[in-house]
A protein has these predicted regions:
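Glycine-rich segments within core transmembrane alpha-helices of 12-TM secondary carriers
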Residues: 151-172, 385-395
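Helix-loop boundary and gating motifs at the non-cytosolic
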Residues: 6-67, 241-248, 252-280
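C-terminal ends and interior cores of transmembrane alpha-helices
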Residues: 95-111, 313-339
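Helix-to-loop junctions at the C-terminal end of transmembrane segments
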Residues: 72-86, 290-304, 402-403
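Juxtamembrane intracellular "pre-TM" segments in multi-pass secondary transporters
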Residues: 2-18, 208-246
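Cytoplasmic membrane-interface "Motif A"-like loop-to-helix N-cap segments
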Residues: 81-95, 300-315
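Intracellular juxtamembrane helix-capping segments at the cytosolic ends
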Residues: 129-142, 359-372
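Hydrophobic core of transmembrane alpha-helices in multi-pass small-molecule transporters
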Residues: 101, 112-130, 333-359
Length: 440
């Protein structure tokens, strides 16, 4: 039996190059999962802030502040990276910075809100801007009709790593009796060390071609960056389909950010214990692996636009279903019933959320790569990063509505963001956008 036929990248050249790139996707999972999704948001609320009336808003502002910094610097950093051929240096620096500051989160004591903010802000900034530089390598790793497969397989590997992290986390919680949020500091140190370890293959083997263009007059990095960025913005009218895609990313990226940063908090509010919470996130992760299979195997054949629309429709239906569950749960609680409201619908919702998270994230990255002009990849992915980071800042309206009006209304706001993203995606002409990129 030939097992190689089950390997999606079989026959691709530069296998070491591909795996060194995938390694950084795997590194990212420790921060995405342990810090942003599973543990740190709960630790921040229960141990650091210790005030239910403001914890959601403080968390959203802390996270949003780091995203605002990333959003402001992403396009400029991308322009500099393209001009000076320093994408790899920026990528590795971001990995080292994120790993070190993540380890520092293990030092936080109860009530030390400012220390938590001062450690989390640079860690999340480095993690977020590193995602942009990592994605900008994608067009050079595969042919244009293979980027969906590479992106999807890398996301599948990252989700498999996340599943391993979940098993290790759940095992440590049960064996070492670390169920209490105040006992989670060792997990933060572990997350930082994991990030640093998987950055090493990227540092050793990922190759970046050198540009031969002359540096713009003025010479320094800031001048270079602003000149290139200004030219890109001036040419934006030629790439209107890419502009639609980046705009859509802003809105459905908000939905993905809400899931990443509020899924564990919502699950706790609906009666999940800490071990249940780990299993719930494991279910989301497994569904995410399934979600990456479609972009890996079919996106290049099905079409990037059609793939994104399918995944968006699934997410929109899921958000509306979640809002209905929240409404029925609150009505049940208001009725004074002593019978616990069933949680099985949350497991269905979790599966659909995970499917959308894996499939939409991978499909979006590949779609941007398909529409990006050659030799401007880091600039385009810098602007892509700007949209995604702004989408994270847009989680604050969700948090405000959640705190002041309730979960049902907040989830309807989430569905509205996804609907706008779907409408913008419908305006994209995939073939026209790709042709415009190749003519640049």
């Amino acid at each position: 039996m030939n097992l190689r036929r089950f390997y999606p990248l079989d026959g691709f050249p530069r296998q070491r190059q591909l795996w060194s790139w995938i390694s950084f996707d795997v590194a990212n999972q420790s921060f995405t999962l342990i810090i942003n999704t599973l543990l740190f948001s709960v630790f921040f609320s229960q141990v650091v802030v210790q005030n239910d009336a403001i914890d959601d808003r403080v968390w959203a502002l802390t996270y949003g502040g780091s995203m605002l910094l990333t959003a402001l610097l992403s396009p400029l950093a991308g322009a500099v990276a393209d001009e000076r051929s320093c994408k790899k240096r920026f990528l590795i620096a971001s990995g080292l910075m994120c790993g070190v500051f993540t380890c520092g989160l293990g030092l936080i004591q109860p009530g030390q809100m400012w220390l938590a903010v001062l450690l989390y802000l640079p860690a999340n900034f480095a993690f977020s801007i590193g995602e942009n530089f990592l994605a900008s390598f994608l067009p050079g790793l595969a042919k244009q009709d293979q980027v969906g497969r590479v992106s999807g397989f890398s996301w599948a590997c990252a989700y498999a790593a996340a599943l391993l992290l979940l098993i290790l986390t759940a095992g440590a919680m049960m064996v070492l009796k670390l169920e209490s949020a105040e006992a989670w500091r060792p997990f933060f140190v572990f997350a930082g060390l994991w990030f640093l370890a998987f950055t090493i293959p990227t540092a050793l083997y990922l190759h970046e071609p050198q540009n031969e263009r002359a540096v713009h007059p003025g010479g320094n990095l800031l001048t270079t960056g602003f000149v290139r960025l200004g030219k890109t913005l001036k040419d934006a009218g030629r790439y209107k389909d890419l502009a639609y895609l980046l705009g859509a990313s802003l809105f459905y990226g908000t939905g993905m950010s809400v899931v990443v940063f509020f899924a564990s908090k919502l699950a706790v509010e609906y009666g999940f214990e800490q071990v249940d919470l780990v299993i719930f996130v494991a279910v989301i992760t497994l569904s995410g692996i399934v979600g990456t299979i479609i972009p890996t195997l079919y996106q290049d054949k099905l079409g990037h636009r059609r793939s994104v629309l399918i995944f968006l429709a699934v997410w929109l239906a899921t958000a509306l279903g979640f809002a209905l569950y929240a409404y029925l749960y609150e009505a049940h609680a208001a009725g004074g019933s002593l019978v616990k409201y069933p949680t099985w619908p949350l497991w269905v919702i979790g599966n659909l959320l995970g499917f959308g998270l894996g499939s939409l994230g991978s499909a979006n990255r590949a779609f941007v790569s398909y529409l990006a002009p050659p030799n401007r990849e880091a600039e385009v992915f810098g602007i892509w990063g700007l949209m995604w980071k702004l989408s994270a800042i847009m989680t604050f309206p969700f948090a405000w509505v959640k705190d002041t009006m309730g979960n049902t209304q907040a989830l309807l706001v989430l569905a509205g963001f996804l609907l706008v993203g779907l409408v913008l995606t419908l305006r994209i002409n995939e073939k026209r956008g790709h042709a415009a990129a190749q003519q640049s």
